[in-house]
Every structure is written in C-alpha cells, then in structure tokens.
Regions:
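Loop-to-transmembrane alpha-helix initiation sites
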Residues: 124-126, 175-181, 224, 255-260, ...
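Cytosolic-side transmembrane-helix boundaries in multi-pass membrane proteins
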Residues: 1-21, 25, 208-222, 294-333
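Alpha-helical transmembrane segments within multi-pass membrane transporters and channels
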Residues: 89-132, 286-287
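Helix-loop-helix "hairpin" substructures at the membrane interface of multi-pass membrane proteins
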Residues: 94-102, 108-112, 167-250
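Transmembrane helix-bundle core of multi-pass membrane transporters
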Residues: 120, 124-196, 226, 246-253, ...
Length: 333
C-alpha cells in the first residue's frame, strides 16, 4: 500500500515536471530567446520570493487549512525590524540581528493565528483573513507608511551577490542570485521533514483527518503550534530576502501583499488531484516554477496582463486535470 501511494505521488510530480518542459519548449518555438541561459537565470531569480512565499502556505495546507495572512506577515516582519533600525539611526547592524528580528515578529504573528485557530476554534481561513486585515492597519497606523531606502551594508552586499551570470543576444547581463542555493536547501530540508520524520507524518495526519489524528494519540494542538511557529520563521526569512533583493523596504509591497492566490495555486497544483497532501514540498516547488515560467515568458512575448491571468488559470486547470487523471487511474488498479 505504501508503495502504491509513493507511485501515485511520483507520477503526479512527474506529470507536472513534464508539463513544465512542454510549456517551456512551446514558448521556445514562439521565441527561441526564451530557451536561452540568460532567460532561464531571469526566471529562476524572479521565482526566489514566490518560492519562499509558498512555504508557509504549504505547511498550513498540509494541515488542512488555508492561510490568508502569510504575505502580510512576510512583508511587515522585515519592514518593522528595518524601520526600528532606521529610526534609531544606527550606523550599522549585523545582518543576523535583522534576520532574527524579522523571524521573531513572524513567530509572534503566527502565535496569534494559532491562538485563534486552536483555542478560539475559528477556521484557519477566517482567522488568518482577520489577522491579515488587522496587521495591514496596525503597520500603517502604529509603525509607518514610509519607505526604508537605506539598508544595512550586509543586506546591500547580499543583494548584489551572484551565483552565475549570462549575457543575452542584445548584450544585456542576467544574474542568477546566490540565494537560489539557500532556497533549494530549504526546500530539501522541508522535504525530509515532511516525508521522513514523525513530525511531518503528524502534519499529514492532521490534514487528512484531524479527529482521527486526535484519536490516534497525536497532540494536535502541539503539532499545530510548532507548524505555525515554523511558518512564522519562514515568513521572517522571506521578508528579509525580499527586501534585500528589492534594496529597500516598504510596509505593504504590492509584489508580495495581495499575491496570496498565486501561492495557494502553486500549492494546489503541487498536491494535484490527490485528497492527501503527501509530496507537497516537491509539488509546491514545481507549482511555483510552472506559474513563474508562464508569467515571465508571457511578459517577454508582450502579452497583456489580463491575458496572462487567463492563460495562467488555464494552465492551473490543465495541470490539476492531468494529475487527477493519474490518481484515478492508479486508484482503479
């Protein structure tokens, strides 16, 4: 039985990977420059923040919920930390302090989510939607609406760190940012946590059937607490990465806040038509890459934004349909 489940998960991800390759080649037929190394670097670099943003959502979805606060928490965790540094006029501060400050704020925000979900018994979607709105008002009313234009030197240096560079046919240089290593390592660690540890299995069990998990002796409240804390840590890291790459910080950046559905779509594509979330980490990675591939290349082809949204929606439906068919076929065997 375990082997059968593994095969379903593998085929689901394999179909998604094949879909990415097919779409990439189709774009390449229309415009051969899309297949270039420089464009690949551009897509991967633009996918860094979406890849990080999808991780806290992935954890909540694995437990059977939907998080609507992760984008705001990611944005304000870094902004508040940098704003405090900026207001105090500190000449310099170690990057690790900024990271730890952002992580601490992310954890506090998710502890609020946990309290509302676990103690007050509000659904995850409603609770996080309320926290989303509350935090937006809080940061603008009590912190600031001003930009932080000058970042600590450590973040400035990190923002210009390149793993590789490539020049396109027009002489424009594209950079593959070094943080791609960190993002990939983080996905690998979370993959092993979710698939190979007891904690990951407990998360899957809660997502499949919370009451059954409780009857099986799983401390649902404790597992949810640690999962929410981990989501807060991921949001803090995401916020710092975003601000470093942007080279400034603002309270509610439009390329983060309001992008909840993009991350939800990536996670949904990742788990495919399966009723269970197993294999969600690898699936989420591929889901983000698929959406970023479509979005970036449509921009390169000069397609209007409303058509980009339409095509992205079609791609999501096709990806889910293929994966659902694979699951049904396996279930009949």
């Amino acid at each position: 039985m375990k082997i059968g489940k593994f095969e379903i998960r593998l085929n689901s991800q394999l179909v998604l990977l094949c879909l990415i390759v097919i779409i990439w080649l189709c774009f390449g037929i229309v415009n051969p420059n899309i297949l270039s190394i420089s464009n690949t670097y551009s897509i991967l670099s633009s996918a860094l923040v979406p890849l990080m943003l999808a991780l806290p959502q992935m954890l909540i979805v694995a437990m059977g919920g939907t998080d609507m606060s992760f984008t705001v928490i990611s944005a304000i965790s870094s902004y508040i930390t940098l704003r405090i540094w900026d207001v105090n006029g500190a000449a310099e501060i170690p990057t690790i302090i900024i990271i730890l400050g952002a992580i601490a704020i992310g954890i506090v925000c998710y502890l609020i989510n946990w309290f509302l979900v676990d103690r007050v018994k509000i659904s995850t979607f409603i609770a996080t939607l309320g926290v989303n709105s509350m935090l937006k008002g809080f940061v603008l009313a009590f912190v600031s609406s001003s930009y932080v234009n000058s970042l600590p030197s450590g973040l400035k240096a990190f923002s210009t760190s390149a793993l590789a560079t490539a020049v396109n046919s027009e002489g424009v240089e594209y950079v593959l940012h070094i943080s791609i290593i960190f993002v990939i390592l983080l996905y690998i660690l979370l993959y092993f946590m979710m698939e190979k540890t007891m904690f990951g299995r407990k998360i899957y069990s809660i997502g499949a059937d919370e009451d059954a998990a409780r009857r099986a002796g799983i401390n649902v409240s404790r597992v949810r607490l640690f999962a929410f804390i981990l989501a807060g840590i991921l949001c803090g890291l995401t916020g710092v990465l975003h601000d470093s790459l942007s080279r400034f910080s603002m309270p509610l950046p439009p390329d983060v806040v309001g992008k909840e559905l993009n991350s939800i779509a990536a996670v949904v594509i990742g788990i495919g038509g399966s009723k269970k979330a197993s294999g969600i980490v690898a699936g989420t990675f591929l889901g983000v890459i698929l959406l970023q591939l479509v979005s970036s290349n449509l921009v390169m082809l000069g397609v209007p934004s409303y058509w980009q949204q339409f095509v992205s929606g079609i791609i999501i439906l096709i990806g889910l349909a293929f994966q659902a068919i694979q699951v049904v076929k396996k279930a009949k065997r």
